[in-house]
Curated annotation (Swiss-Prot):
Consequence of gene loss (knockout): Deletion decreases hemagglutination but no decrease in fimbriation levels.
InterPro entries referenced in this protein's UniProt entry, alphabetically: Adhesion_dom_fimbrial (IPR000259), Adhesion_dom_fimbrial_sf (IPR036937), Adhesion_dom_sf (IPR008966), Bact_Fimbrial_Adh_Pro (IPR050263)
Species the sequence originates in: Escherichia coli O6:K15:H31 (strain 536 / UPEC)
Gene3D superfamilies registered for this protein in UniProt: Fimbrial-type adhesion domain
Name by which UniProt lists this protein: S-fimbrial protein subunit SfaG
Task performed by this protein: Fimbriae (also called pili), polar filaments radiating from the surface of the bacterium to a length of 0.5-1.5 micrometers and numbering 100-300 per cell, enable bacteria to colonize the epithelium of specific host organs.
Amino acid sequence: MVKDIIKTVTFSCMLAGSMFVTCHVCAAGSVVNITGNVQDNTCDVDINSRNFDVSLGSYDSRQFTAAGDTTPASVFHVGLTSCGSAVRAVKLTFTGTPDNQEAGLIQINSINGARGVGIQLLDKDKHELKINVPTTIALMPGTQTIAFYARLKATYLPVKAGNVDAVVNFVLDYQ
């Protein structure tokens, strides 16, 4: 008798489970619409803008008399070619290691590097660009050259003399 009850219960559960699965499958009737758009809104980075050096020059550490003092800015360019007909803007982010004293600046990497200064990046109008923070730049179809500037900025005194080395990458995110 106990065996019969167990068999019956087991069979009933399997039957009920099969009915549930069958009904669930019968009720499924979804539609997935997939849409998209192919645009011509990107550019190629000019070969001369892929790997290059920016010289900031040589300065006496004593010329920095207060935190916030800067050197003259050195211009550099990022060239974009073959910008598509739909291009309007790009979010450009300079990425690198932020300075320990002022997070918007780039940290000097050298073991024997200068101390008390960081590298500041500026846009074409010489407004500060913070490292690792995107900035939107208007673009037009075709070829264009975007000017940027780099300079040293004192973060604390006294500034210690040494080498100035840093690696910065840039990332383009088209809008």
